[in-house]
Curated annotation (Swiss-Prot):
Top EC group: oxidoreductase
Residues spanning the membrane: none
InterPro entries (UniProt xref): FAD-bd, FAD-dep_Monooxygenase_BioMet, FAD-dep_OxRdtase_2_FAD-bd, FAD/NAD-bd_sf
Name of the molecule in the record: Flavin-dependent monooxygenase pboD
Naturally occurring in which organism (per UniProt): Aspergillus ustus
EC number(s) per entry: 1.14.13.-
Domain of life: Eukaryota
Cofactor(s) essential for the protein: FAD
Keyword GTP-binding listed: no
Biological role stated in the UniProt entry: Flavin-dependent monooxygenase; part of the gene cluster that mediates the biosynthesis of protubonine B, a hydroxylated and diacetylated cyclo-L-Trp-L-Leu derivative. PboD is also able to accept other cyclodipeptides (CDPs) as substrates, including cyclo-L-Trp-L-Trp, cyclo-L-Trp-L-Tyr, cyclo-L-Trp-L-Phe, cyclo-L-Trp-L-Met, cyclo-L-Trp-L-Ala, cyclo-L-Trp-L-Pro and cyclo-L-Trp-Gly.
Gene Ontology molecular function, alphabetical: FAD binding; monooxygenase activity
KW NADP (keyword) present: yes
Length: 486
């Protein structure tokens, strides 16, 4: 089966193919869901996008990085216009400065994979807003304020029931509604199983004007940002502080990773239809939470470089989130092959991987192409091939998170990303500054070629037919896009 023989194989203006007659329903307007809707539209599929939220907030969330592997997909949208729009909202630094608790600098290291024409670091809400608006220019049917209450599937198609009783039918459903979404439960028949890491992240986004009451303090990170943004990271035993500016110092993002300081027994048990706050709580900010975060660095000599920014943060822009690890899933596709989960619903990564958004975009692109190549009569085959390709990477990334997570998952590409992350945790939270002084580059963020230079779209076009033939013959197909250590 080749692209020339499939219904949607002829490429038109702006890379959008002729109609495939495949009706796709996407659940979730996060990064993965929007990417799925856009990529499916570009591959000729008819798309409906639904989400329970009433509107998209461009100021929601903190910061996110999209690496080269995700950005190369976005760069094709709108003849490059979407890529250029994102660039105008990004952090344009090319360096990351490493410091210890005393504020001593251990040099600046190249921030690979996120520079101009390679990737971006920006506010998460701004990115979602840009993608949402672009989906609108394509004429994609977007239905906000539409909670999904039920999923249905037969051998011939899938459907969702919205609150109020409306039923939307499709040839397939792409679920990108998160780890606690109903789509994941329908596909896997499993409740999310998590493992405690003992760590939490306080994270926030704020604007330069929020700092005015504290301008008399040493806000060093703003120095020189009228010309170029900055990123600074402080490491100490048991804590890490990251800060970076956006749009030449007009906005700031900060993240403090620390030991869990919330008594989980005091959190309320879940009510019907809600997630367990004691499992994966994300608490909205308060003044007391800001004070608690500041207390994490109370004895740091460099506290005056950090505290003004933390104390200036509007509480509503602060989130405190427990870091957990999860076992990789064995299945992303529903029994009849008409539903697939992507993004966090399929593979919630530990934050340190820095690949959550990029991998969700890759998921979306692969599913859209697989549907294009398989055609309307072979939708289940398309989703199972997409699962085969993408789960390899995701398992590697998930298992990378912590040494405490020992898994025997069968998806080596994803497994490798998590292993790498656990090594980073060791370096970050148990730094040997004598060793770092001799070789500061050991704390530089990694940029493995197998990950950042991977072209997920080209890979599907090259390998789809081989995988389809192997499945038809009952042979095991060995995925080629695995990391060197897998």
């Amino acid at each position: 089966m080749t692209i020339e023989s499939c219904p949607g194989g002829r490429v038109g203006e702006d890379g959008i193919t002729n109609p495939s007659n495949i009706r796709v329903l996407v659940v979730g307007v996060g990064i993965g869901g929007l990417a799925a809707a856009i990529e499916c539209h570009r591959k000729g599929h008819s798309v409906i996008l639904v989400d329970k939220i009433a509107q998209v907030d461009p100021l929601a969330g903190d910061g996110i990085g999209i690496g080269t592997n995700g950005a190369r997909i976005i760069a094709k949208w709108g003849g490059g216009r979407v890529h250029d729009q994102i660039l105008s909202h990004r952090c344009d630094t090319r360096k990351i400065e490493i410091l210890n608790r005393q504020g001593e600098s251990f040099g600046q290291h190249e921030l690979k994979g996120y520079g101009r024409d390679h990737g971006y670091m920006l506010n998460r809400g701004q990115l979602v807003s840009i993608l949402f608006d672009y989906a609108g220019t394509l004429g994609i049917d977007k239905r906000l304020g539409s909670p999904v209450t039920e999923y249905r599937e037969t051998e011939m198609g899938a459907a969702v029931v919205l609150e109020g009783g409306e039923v939307i039918e499709a040839d397939c459903v792409i679920c990108s509604d998160g780890v606690h979404g109903a789509g994941r439960k329908f596909v896997t028949s499993l409740d999310p199983v998590s493992r405690e890491s003992g760590w939490a992240m306080s994270r926030a986004y704020l604007r330069k004007e929020d700092l005015k009451p504290h301008r008399d303090r040493d806000v060093r990170i703003l120095d020189g940002t009228d010309k170029q943004d900055r990123m600074m990271v402080w490491f100490d035993h048991g804590i890490q502080v990251s800060m970076w500016t956006v749009k030449h110092g007009e906005e700031l993002v900060w993240i403090v990773t620390h030991k869990v300081s919330v008594d989980l027994s005091l959190l309320p048990p879940p009510t019907l239809g809600t997630k367990d706050a004691r499992d994966t709580w994300t608490m909205e900010g308060s003044e007391s939470m800001i004070e608690d975060t500041i207390s994490q660095i109370h004895d740091w000599p460099s506290r005056n470089m950090i505290e003004p920014i933390l104390r200036s943060t509007p509480p509503k822009r602060l989130l405190n989130q427990k870091i957990i690890t999860r076992e990789p899933l064995d299945r992303w596709v529903s029994p009849h092959g008409r539903m697939i989960i992507i993004g966090d619903a399929a593979h919630p990564y530990p934050p340190i991987s820095g690949q959550g958004g990029s991998q969700a975009i890759e998921d979306a692109a692969v599913v859209a192409i697989a549907l294009q190549l398989a055609g309307k009569d072979h939708v289940p085959l398309a989703l199972r091939i997409a699962e085969k390709i993408r789960s390899v990477t995701s398992h590697y990334l998930m298992l990378q998170g912590h040494h405490m997570l020992k898994s025997t998952g069968s998806h080596p590409r994803a497994t490798a990303i998590q292993t790498e992350a656990s090594h980073l945790y060791e370096l970050m939270f148990k730094p040997d500054w004598g060793v770092v002084a001799k070789n500061p580059s050991i704390l530089a963020p990694p940029c493995p070629k197998w990950l950042f230079q991977h072209d997920s779209q080209a890979y599907v076009y090259a390998e789809f037919g081989k995988i389809a033939e192997a499945m038809a013959d009952g042979r095991e197909y060995v995925i080629a896009n695995t990391p060197p250590s897998a």
